Regions:
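Contiguous, well-ordered alpha-helical segments that form the cores/surfaces of helical PPI scaffolds
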Residues: 1, 90, 295-308, 331
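Internal intein/HINT superfamily modules and their associated LAGLIDADG
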Residues: 1-82, 468
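Short, glycine-/Ser/Thr-/acidic-enriched flexible segments
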Residues: 2-4, 27, 42-44, 54-56, ...
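A broad structural signal for short, well-ordered beta-strand segments within beta-sheet-rich domains
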Residues: 47-49, 302, 453
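Generic structural "secondary-structure junction" signal
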Residues: 49-52, 71-72, 79-81, 87, ...
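Conserved catalytic cores of very large enzyme subunits
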Residues: 83-291, 312, 318-495
Length: 496
């Protein structure tokens, strides 16, 4: 009946590697609540130390095999934690303005320049790749940080120092590749952030932001995503489509401007101390901390928008008529964003929104409002006739399962991918395991040299067994576990 005793019991249980929950029961006799502590076994969990802080409850400082957090909420002890979403650009050779800068050691600029440390760059990249290839304790890949490698016209494809990159790509498909081979941009012109946000630093240089390659001091204050399928469904003709699109874009612009004002106000109040420190020079020069940050507008479901607009499943983004109108829509958005930029003196860009939850939420809301009259991605292609939850395709992507030919998919997407000014990524799904690093390297090279798409990744197929970890290829059952129990491929089962 004593809450302090309950707290201590939960601490003891957690230190012993157990989870626990607390139920509160009203007494049948007396007035004190009765606390029932249930002990739950957690695998491979131990606590480094436990301490009480000035907070509503108890926070434990944990140490688990995969560096997650042990927390308690409403009496329940559970494993939690959210890995920071990080993207790092791994330069393989000292490049751009950074190569000519003196290195900083002990807080002081030295006479040696970054270009003098090629050997160390190779060592760091190799060590990074080896750690990423090991994965975690269960053989799962590390989701973050996402490494970006720049592919330029002078990229040395046969350099043996790059072999760890191709091995890492073949095993997990971890790296993203920034394609500058068929682009007028240079590596210093772009900064890759999160899973697809990619900012054009040339816009900042036009403003005279005093930026240099290693210190862009830029980002996006937020993304507003536009539901294109609803516009396509409601529009009576092309003129009406653009009228509705303009209205949604104006609302997005207004909301981002409101958010920008709030962020500036919160910054002044000291709510973002780290950002305030690093953006102090921007504030001195322009009077605003976030002057070099973009207002980002994204899109979802262009494919379904075209189908709903033409009232014809065949006129999707891959059809001649659908493709033409789809490109017209995106070019219209780019031009309108440029108009916003000129009128507001704020930076705007267009992003291929990852979607994730929004693809389902938009489709669910539209189905509730318009019923089965509006077409979602779940109603077409490989999903047709299946009872699955509604969703829309990400940004301007082709329908799921449209083709297994990666080059057909790239042919369809190349022109669309190049129209995003705020970032996009084309995931190249292999559908099988990759065993040859030479094949991986040749595939990346073929894509980079034959397409203009700015950002892409290679995604091989692999499986993870809770016991044996990483297994190349697709496996519904672990072959190593099967072998241990005596099962062989093709063996018949006897009914018991």
């Amino acid at each position: 009946t004593d809450i302090e005793v309950v707290n201590q019991l939960q601490i003891i249980a957690t230190n012993c590697g157990y989870g626990s929950t607390v139920l509160v029961r009203k007494p049948t006799i007396g007035t004190k609540d009765i606390f029932v502590v249930r002990i739950i076994k957690h695998q491979e969990t131990y606590i480094k130390n436990v301490k009480k802080v000035d907070y509503e409850g108890i926070i434990w400082c944990p140490h688990t095999k995969n560096e997650t957090i042990i927390a308690r909420r409403n009496g329940k002890v559970f494993v939690t934690g959210n890995t920071p979403f990080t993207n790092i650009t791994m330069d393989l050779i000292p490049s751009g303005q950074l190569a000519q800068q003196g290195v900083i050691i002990g807080g002081k600029i030295q006479k040696e320049k970054y270009k003098d440390f090629q050997k160390e760059m190779v060592m760091i990249n190799k060590a990074f790749c080896e750690i990423m290839m090991e994965g975690d304790a269960q053989g799962r890949l590390f989701s973050y940080p996402i490494p970006t490698y720049n592919l330029t016209k002078d990229f040395d494809w046969d350099n043996p120092d790059y072999e760890p990159i191709w091995k890492m790509t073949a095993k997990y498909g971890i790296p993203y590749f920034s394609n500058f081979i068929n682009s007028d941009m240079k590596p210093d012109d772009a900064r890759s952030m999160c899973c697809r946000l990619r900012l054009d630093n040339r816009e900042l240089r036009k403003r005279g932001g005093g930026l240099f390659g290693a210190n862009p001091l830029t980002g996006s204050i937020g993304v507003v995503t536009i539901n294109l399928p609803r516009i396509g469904y409601e529009a009576k003709n092309k003129r009406d489509y653009f009228k509705r699109l303009n209205k949604q874009m104006d609302l997005a612009k207004k909301s981002l401007q409101i958010k920008r004002k709030f962020l500036e106000k919160y910054m002044e109040k000291g709510l973002y101390p780290y950002s305030k420190f690093y953006l102090a020079d921007i504030k001195k020069r322009f009077g605003e901390y976030y002057k070099n940050h973009f207002n980002t507008i994204g899109i979802l479901g262009l494919n379904e928008s075209l189908i709903n607009f033409f009232k014809d499943e065949k006129k999707d983004i891959t059809s001649k008529e659908g493709r033409k109108f789809g490109l017209e829509i995106m070019n219209h958005m780019r031009e309108r964003l440029m108009t916003y930029q000129q009128k507001t003196n704020e930076l705007f860009n267009l992003e291929a929104t990852p979607g994730e939850g929004a693809t389902y939420k938009f489709a669910k809301a539209d189905k509730k409002r318009f019923g089965d009259d509006i077409i979602s991605a779940a109603d077409i292609g490989k999903h047709k006739g299946q009872d699955i939850a509604p969703y829309y395709t990400n940004s301007s992507q082709i329908a799921v399962g449209f083709t297994d030919d990666i080059f057909e998919a790239l042919d369809q997407q190349d022109e669309f991918q190049c129209l995003y000014t705020g970032g996009t990524v084309q995931h190249v799904y292999i559908g099988e395991q990759l065993t040859s690093t030479e094949a991986v390297k040749n595939l990346v090279r073929k894509i980079a040299e034959n397409y203009k798409l700015p950002y892409f990744s290679i995604t091989p197929t692999f499986s993870v067994c809770p016991k044996h970890g990483y297994i190349a290829g697709e496996h519904f059952y672990c072959p190593k576990c099967d072998c241990e129990v005596g099962y062989k491929e093709g063996m018949e089962f006897n009914e018991v």
